[in-house]
Amino acid sequence: MEQVVDKSIFFRLKIFVASILGFIQGKLLKIFSICLLPSAIKKVRLIKNYREQNANIAIVVLCEHIGDIISCEPVSTFLKTKFDKTVIWIVNEKYKEVIELFENVDFVLPVSCVSEYFYMSLFLKSFEIHNLHFDKKQCRKYGLVLRNNNKLFHIGNYVKYGSLLQTFSVTGGLPMLDNKPHLMLDEEDRFPEIDYPFCVIHVESNEPTRTMTKEKWIEILSHFPDNRFVEVGLHSELNDASNCCSIYCGKLSLVDSFYLVKKCSLFVGVDSSMAHVANALQKRSLIIMGRYHDYDNYMPFSGFDVNMKIVRSSEQVRDMSIEIIVDELKEIMKN
């Protein structure tokens, strides 16, 4: 009995110490974030110098992630065409090359993290800023919290009200936009070695509930022995499928992967960054979507058209039966 009590006390003490250490670590990270201030001030000066030559400036702030950023491309088009704005887009440096594909963005300003923009915002009060982040966006690196006066949507409810673009545009103080995004890719063929018709397949997701097991995916592909698939993503899941080429996984830049999607005849994948790329490139697509949190009929994509076919389930994607996916894919491949 004493041993059980001792273990219980030890366990509680361990949790208490861990929480204290976590609290201290969080506070220290916020203190250390001050090291970003010189860089932030330098970038504020860049913006102010830029304003001297371009008076009618609007700053769009959306630092991450790929799918969110691509979905919000129409924000820049709206500001440019409606108000003739010179558009500056502040984004995480990892995604700078994505914004460079937005036709109506005049200047891309990369930051290392959300906290760097937090410090920049202290000196940008006189600028027109459209912060597309939901209120209380927390920096993953330093923990600083970005505030937004538009509090209608938040991480817990935004999928209930519309597409990413619809909720993000309102969050940024704009009308509710619902246009299709566009990526400005040229006609260059970056994959001349692929000289046959193929489908791009992307099975990775940030959340395990949004994708299926490797075994299920391989079984789906086994129903199409005469079709060629090329997998994109950071990691290969389908290298055991005889009709799937996975050599590009983890080896392409973001923009190279966009060109691969552009070249394919069909995109197949889950609700993920590459699905938003396919939407922006107006590719024929089969997108597999299931229940997400408490919602089983959400629509993250804007400008929806006949090129995109969505297979839905009231279950999470990981629990879906493959039959409905195989049937839809067969129907699409007939045309």
Give short role names for the model-derived ranges.
Residues 1-335:
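Catalytic machinery of carbohydrate-active enzymes
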